[in-house]
Amino acid sequence: TRSSVESRGLGDVYKRQILIYTAPEIARNLLRFRYSMLEQARTRAREMNLQGALFPWRTSNGEEASAYYAAGTAQYHINADIMYALKKYAEITNDKSLLYNEGVEMLVETARMWVDLGFYSDRKGGKFCINGVTGPDEYTTVVNNNAYTNMMARENLFFAVKTVKEMLDAYPDQYENLKHRTNLETDEIDAWQKAADNMYVPFDRKLGIHPQDEDFLDLEAWDIKNTPRELFPLLLHYHPLVIYRHQVIKQADVVLAMFLLGNLFTDKQKKRNFDYYDPLTTGDSSLSACIQSIIAAEVGANEKAMGYARYAVLMDLADVGGNMAEGCHIASMGGTWMVAVYGFAGMRDYDGHITFEP
């Protein structure tokens, strides 16, 4: 299956949200496009000294096309992002054919990658930790225990366990075929469950927030308010090493986790996380404003919700970034749909259950 839409970064989360509900056949084709890259992803994992498969951060043909590893290849969460899109698609469409064929094979290989990438740390009470990764925020790179990455990896592992066990119970012939295709061993499934059950997720009890990563709260906060507007986006005006030693965020990270996995956060945690991270977020990525708008609406910051919504809607219409000549921001367009549906209409769709709270 080929695609005219490149596979890049968080597009699996942003574009597929709207497509699953409005054009599920296209969402299905895009997931099958990802599956067509699985062999290259297996090769990429071996290059990175890992088992399983590691999908590229940017690609049009299955080969990694990112120029800068810290803001590209280090975003291992791409595996979990793709599997999140698969999970949403399966829950909403009930398409067992895709899930139990191409989908489950990707689940097996991505789960293998996670248990090989992480380890059980005695210093963290035996919790499963994932080090040397970059989360969605590309202004904070190659860190330990990025909250978004760990939480999404946990969902990836849980979903892999659930799907494989369902196949074993309900479709034993297909399960045997899967074992043959992937050399799956029963003890691997137990290893996925154990890693997911013991996943380390940073939390600061004093502040009542989820630190973006292990060391984020120890960094000096960037003075965004007094940084001249002409020096944004920061990545075009400051050396990465200057940016990396500060608390400054290119795009929603913990806040994105609160949108995708909102049922895992309390209302108080959402409010405190948003209040802490929003002032540190530059919005230098076109993918940030839509997520900030959705969570702002949820926590009652209505003026901010509307302001971010306007910014997201005008990203291409008003050429906010000054780069429309290079093409439309497809993922951001998907984000504007999410603002209307998830933000102002208050829709949530966790575990296949849809609710509305406008």
Each model region followed by its residue ranges:
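Active-site core of glycosidic bond-cleaving carbohydrate-active enzymes
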Residues: 11-37, 101, 158, 165, ...
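Acidic/polar loop patches that form or flank catalytic/metal-binding clefts of enzymes
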Residues: 25-31, 163-174, 304, 346-357
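Catalytic cores of secreted or luminal carbohydrate-active enzymes
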Residues: 329-358
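Acidic/histidine-rich catalytic neighborhood
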Residues: 109, 113-184
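Helix-terminus loop motifs that line ligand-binding clefts
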Residues: 25-84, 90, 94-101, 114-127, ...
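Single conserved hydrophobic/aromatic residue that forms the stacking wall/gate
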Residues: 1-10
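Hydrophobic, well-ordered secondary-structure elements that form the walls
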Residues: 107, 292, 340
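TPR repeat positional signature
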Residues: 79, 83-86, 149, 157, ...
